[in-house]
Amino acid sequence: MSDIRLEPVTGSDPELKLALSASGLPTEDLEDTGRSFFKAVSSDRGTVGYAGIEACGDDVLLRSIVILPEHRGKALGKSLTRETLKTVNVSSAVFLATTSAAPFFESLGFVVVERADVPPAVLATRQLSGICPASATIMKLDRAPT
């Protein structure tokens, strides 16, 4: 059972931009096409965080997972990630780039992959082709083939 539910928001949502900026996450490509963003709402209707995904052909880039500071330490990041992954077609490979959260994502089933093993459509995203540093860790969700 999840502690949160997702509500769609646009890339131009000012609270989304503020939350990402405050956490040091990129905001420059939020309004580009192919992106979907969500506000994580608790049972009392309060916003606890935000998440996003980007379509890359048949694959998906998980991006912008952020829990607001006052809600951290309650395992909501895992709930938010799991709920966001439910929006992705089970046949899609899910990738992400991180500079600091690899252990967190490993706990959710992601494994480190080499850039050479990442599909061209994912590598061509603004996130992986220029916004994230080349030193970012690239990860893929390790799930059974469908």
Enumerate the predicted regions with their spans.
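C-terminal "cap" of GNAT-fold acetyltransferases
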Residues: 118-146
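A generic "binding-loop/recognition-motif" signal
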Residues: 12, 58, 100-101
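Conserved active-site alpha-helix within GNAT-family acetyltransferase domains
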Residues: 99-127
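Conserved GNAT acetyl-CoA-binding A-motif
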Residues: 87-100
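Short amphipathic alpha-helix that is part of the acyltransferase structural core
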Residues: 1-29, 41, 46, 136-138, ...
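Conserved acetyl-CoA-binding loop-helix of GNAT-fold acetyltransferases
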Residues: 67, 73-86
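Conserved beta-strand in the GNAT
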Residues: 39, 45-54, 59-66
